[in-house]
């Protein structure tokens, strides 16, 4: 459903912005419609295929312990999402300062970028569920095996996506940008090739998010998000005035890898990851 929402969003962006010339309002409207369709689609799917997830009368009672767990986890998730969106807004503001060409290149490239690593993000969410289920069942061995398998699968997929984005960046940009817009395409290619070379970083980060949420430590996911976004914003604003928009592109993966290092270091020290092979 996320993939459908992304495709619908792209199509509606082109229709509202290019055909109807609604500008920013058109982009916002396209996003709302796409997200609404995705949400309703998921609801209908659950009602039709997952009957056991539907609440019954016996479930309709207040449980303070469950409420507290939901409150604590959701609050941390809200903080994480707020930090992410705030960082994205700051980066967007910096990009806008470079003019219309850079804004257009960034808008097109980010859509491609987001679509490219979307499966890795969803894989991280599924990994979180796997970890949580086995943590609740005290299946430490399965968690260890699952972590190793997840790393292998994510690494292989990220390398494949990196190859496609890096070597076909121009063709991907031409999906959204007219061939005559040479400067926009050039900047978009630069963005995609820099990000594309570093998808291992974002793949690892999504696994770390999923792992720490699954073992009941969502606060660590928030810390990693703050490190990733904080590094991105700080480096972008520090070096963009002298190095240009290229500094913004490089700040993004540097933030990923710094957060990865922090998450892995914590896992080794506190989660005993080095004991997994013993």
Regions found by a protein language model. Give the residues of each.
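Alpha-helical transmembrane segments of multi-pass membrane transporters/permeases
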Residues: 1-11, 25, 29-32, 123, ...
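Alpha-helical transmembrane segments of multi-pass membrane proteins
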Residues: 2, 114, 120, 182-208
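Functionally critical, cavity-lining and gating residues within the transmembrane helices
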Residues: 9, 26, 84-88, 99, ...
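Short alpha-helical transmembrane segments in multi-pass integral membrane proteins
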Residues: 19-75, 131-198, 239-278
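Small-residue-rich hydrophobic transmembrane alpha-helices
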Residues: 105-163, 167-169, 202-224
């Amino acid at each position: 459903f996320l993939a459908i929402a992304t495709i619908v969003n792209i199509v509606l962006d082109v229709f509202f912005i290019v055909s109807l010339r609604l500008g920013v309002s058109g982009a916002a409207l396209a996003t709302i419609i796409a997200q609404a369709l995705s949400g309703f689609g998921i609801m209908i799917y659950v009602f039709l295929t997952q009957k056991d997830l539907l609440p019954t009368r016996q479930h309709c009672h207040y449980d303070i312990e469950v409420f507290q767990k939901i409150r604590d986890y959701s609050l941390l998730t809200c903080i994480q999402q707020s930090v992410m969106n705030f960082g994205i807004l700051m980066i967007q503001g910096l990009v806008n300062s470079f003019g219309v060409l850079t804004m257009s290149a960034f808008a097109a490239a980010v859509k491609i970028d987001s679509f490219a690593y979307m499966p890795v993000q969803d894989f991280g969410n599924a990994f979180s569920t796997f970890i949580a289920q086995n943590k609740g069942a005290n299946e430490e061995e399965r968690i260890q095996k699952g972590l190793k398998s997840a790393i292998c699968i994510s690494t292989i997929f990220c390398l494949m996506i990196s190859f496609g984005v890096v070597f076909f960046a121009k063709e991907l940009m031409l999906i959204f940008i007219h061939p005559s817009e040479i400067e926009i395409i050039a900047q978009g290619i630069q963005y995609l090739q820099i990000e594309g070379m570093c998808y291992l970083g974002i793949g690892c980060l999504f696994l770390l998010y999923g792992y720490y949420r699954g073992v009941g430590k969502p606060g660590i996911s928030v810390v990693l998000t703050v490190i990733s976004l904080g590094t991105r914003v700080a480096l972008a604003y520090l070096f963009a005035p002298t190095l240009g928009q290229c500094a913004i592109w490089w700040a993004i993966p540097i933030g990923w890898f710094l957060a990865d290092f922090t998450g892995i270091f914590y896992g080794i020290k506190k989660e005993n990851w080095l004991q997994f092979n013993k």
